[in-house]
Design a protein with these regions (language model features):
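Intrinsic-disorder-associated, low-complexity terminal segments enriched in Asp/Asn/His/Tyr and depleted
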Residues: 3-10
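Membrane-anchoring hydrophobic segments
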Residues: 10-218, 222-223, 229, 272-275, ...
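Short hydrophobic/aromatic segments of transmembrane alpha-helices and their interfaces
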Residues: 30, 163, 235-239, 366-368, ...
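Residue-level signal for alpha-helical transmembrane segments in multi-pass membrane proteins
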Residues: 80, 167-174, 222-225, 241-248, ...
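Helix-loop-helix junctions and helix-breaking kinks within/between transmembrane helices
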Residues: 108-123, 240-266, 377-384, 426-434
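Alpha-helical transmembrane segments of integral membrane proteins
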Residues: 158-162, 233-236, 382
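Internal alpha-helical transmembrane segments
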Residues: 228-259, 263-299
Length: 455
């Protein structure tokens, strides 16, 4: 009798596990919709009680409570696009997932709780973003207008290695007098001082391109093959390269990125299919669970510090920055892309005396933001969002095409650094200064023996 009862319990647990697994799978569009609704509701609660409740003083952060009708519209706008997500089938799906979680949901929410009587502006912005969100997920599925772009003759991998070494030597030769190693966990004040000092140094002018190309293109590319071939000495040398970059820019992301890439590679390699179908659930449920912990343990100093980094500066940052940009450019002139140096060099039409991020924050901070804000709202309002949305859509199609012969495991690592830039900088800065354009050229022009068809 006891054995039969235990067997029944195991069967019930097995069935429940199957049901939960099915709901959390990206193949279930209804599960995606429900998870997006839950995530959006938790996001709203944390934005109201943590971001707005505790940090409203950092800028023009609004929270106008939504009516029932507006809440329903907000939930539909937030959740319907995610029903089109079907897992990481192409690299554009990887871009679109992070863009959805850390740009789209905060953007829609921030517009819905904005202190504004201009409903036409609010709903037109939201509708355009809604259409683009659906298109971005669509292009990551089966729809492929351009297939397999490959430049011939192909450049051998050895040539990329030599170029990487040469660029590293040039970087060290230029920046060696400004290199310092600082513990990112215990010596934060010195880290910020050195970061500011190096950023203002005239002798380091122009080195940003070199650093961005190494960080976002060359180092990830060689790291993938070294991990694939288990060339551990060369893996360590690549880590050393990242540390050299960190010793100049003093950015925590630069120091942590190689470790993130290696861990990500190993996780995806263990079960590529499961990661492809469930990575969205892992990320969203982790944020939901952490938000619950913050709610219960918000008086704990350690929890509060982590929450400030994870929620204020990562999950919700696009939300309050959206409100900063919308408020600012409702009252001030658009840049018409003159915030991009090369365009301003030709037009000499940039309307502000300080960089865009500082202008928007009225000099109180450097409010760098995602490309929908910098290259959209700041550049031309609704028209700017339409232009940059179409540009990004075209870019996703191109990236899908050049990466079609690569394994997903490799693509996760290759494009992770540039995805991290997409979330807080101009799309043109990401392409030119942070390595996306060189990476795209390398992927299209190089034939490495771990290239294979995507599954």
């Amino acid at each position: 009798m006891v054995y039969r009862n235990n067997n029944t319990i195991y069967q019930i647990l097995f069935v429940m596990g199957k049901i939960i697994s099915n709901i959390l799978s990206s193949k279930n569009k209804y599960g995606n919709f429900l998870l997006a609704c839950l995530y959006s509701l938790v996001y709203d609660y944390m934005y109201k009680n943590f971001v707005y409740g505790l940090f409203y003083y950092i800028g023009r952060i609004d929270y106008e409570p939504m009516s029932i009708e507006r809440t329903i519209i907000w939930l539909l706008l937030s959740s319907i696009p995610f029903a089109e997500y079907k897992g990481i089938n192409k690299i554009s799906s990887f871009f679109s997932l992070f863009l959805y979680l850390f740009v789209y949901i905060p953007f829609i929410h921030s517009m819905m709780v904005l202190y504004s009587d201009d409903n036409l502006q609010i709903y037109s912005y939201c509708l355009v973003m809604f259409i683009f969100a659906i298109l971005y997920f669509k292009v990551g599925n089966d729809w492929t207008p351009i297939k397999n772009i490959m430049v011939k003759p192909q450049i051998p991998f050895k040539a990329i290695e030599y170029i990487t070494i040469l660029l590293t030597i040039v970087f060290v030769a230029i920046a060696h007098n400004h290199m310092h190693f600082v513990n990112i966990f215990t010596d934060m004040s010195r880290l910020y001082d050195l970061r500011s000092e190096n950023s203002e140094s005239e002798s380091l002018a122009g080195i940003g391109y070199l650093q961005g190309w190494l960080f976002g293109a060359f180092y990830p590319f060689v790291l993938v093959l070294y991990l694939e071939k288990k060339k551990w000495v060369k893996v360590l040398l690549t880590l050393a390269g990242y540390i050299l970059l960190f010793m100049v820019d003093m950015q925590k992301m630069t120091f942590l990125m190689p470790f993130v890439l290696i861990i990500l590679y190993q996780i995806v390699r263990l079960n590529e299919q499961k990661v492809s179908y469930y990575i969205h659930s892992y990320i969203m449920l982790t944020i939901i669970c952490f938000s619950c912990i913050v709610y219960v343990k918000q008086d704990n100093e350690l929890i509060f510090t982590i929450a400030a980094i994870l929620l204020l500066r990562t999950v919700c940052v696009a939300g309050w920055l959206t409100q900063l940009y919308v408020h600012f450019f409702t009252e001030n002139p658009y840049t018409y892309y003159s915030h991009i140096n090369i365009i301003n060099y030709v037009t000499q039409n940039y309307p502000y005396s300080v960089p865009l991020g500082k202008a928007v924050a009225y000099g109180s901070q450097n409010a760098n933001a995602n490309f929908f804000l910098t290259d959209g709202v700041a550049a031309g309002g609704l028209v700017g969002i339409c232009f940059i949305g179409i540009f990004f859509f075209t870019l996703l199609i191109f990236i899908n095409s050049i990466s079609a012969r690569y394994k997903k495991t490799d693509l996760f690592v290759l494009f992770m650094p540039t995805i991290s830039f997409f979330l807080n900088t101009s799309i043109f800065t990401t392409m030119l200064s942070n390595g996306l354009l060189p990476l795209a050229l390398i992927v299209a022009c190089t034939n490495i023996n771990n290239c294979t068809s995507s599954k």
